[in-house]
Amino acid sequence: MVKLLIKKLHKNIILPEYKTDGSSGMDLMANVEQTVKILPGEKKIISTGIMVAIPEQYEIQIRPRSGLAAKNGISILNTPGTIDSDYRGEIKVILINLGKDIFQINKNDRIAQMIVCPIIKVKLEEVESLPETVRGKGGFGSTDK
């Protein structure tokens, strides 16, 4: 198991945790002093009140919670958000309201999930042409024959 160092910015912060043995992500909670309202079509940056030290060769991905998306149209604007291993600031989440109603966020509401992922660095090699494949240059919808 990989160790992730985490710092609370306030004593009353609830740390992320896996809700089940099979969970891939840990829920992130909103660290807001008062209710935040997100109007339809609006985006807001929401604090979590935590900072982390991610081990080298890992990243954290911030992803939407499926329940918020399905029930309220709430998503993350830059999904998945990437937190690099050398970042040491507070984790914040850019929420967007794609729904039709005003959405309210209160302190400790679960707003996103955090997934720790290994990364693989690659060495780029510029070439004049690429190897051929059956698919070739077929793009969007090209495999729906």
Identify the function of each model-found stretch.
Residues 1-145:
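DUTPase catalytic domain/fold
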